[in-house]
Amino acid sequence: MSDNTMRVKVIAPDRVFYEGDVTFMEFNTIEGIIGIYPRHIPTTVVIAPGVLKISESQGDKTAALHSGFAEILGDSVTILAESVEWPDEIDIR
């Protein structure tokens, strides 16, 4: 992990959904959208349903993120989500 990345782990009840080094991420909280870069001020937030955006050196990823909370530290973010899905996993029926 370099100074330009942070370690992110997204955990759902049934699996570790995502784990990797990211340059930026964004998601909804109960107070609005939060964008997080490496060395963000430490905080804990409550997640509101919406889109999770993850920027890696290889490109961007998006997922549907539902209720949960996030612990944001200077070099890492841990999300505990009630539910989270990649676009191809969403059952629209």
Residue ranges of each PLM-predicted region?
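Short, charged, intrinsically disordered terminal tails
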Residues: 1-5
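Compact, glycine-rich, soluble single-domain proteins
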Residues: 7-93
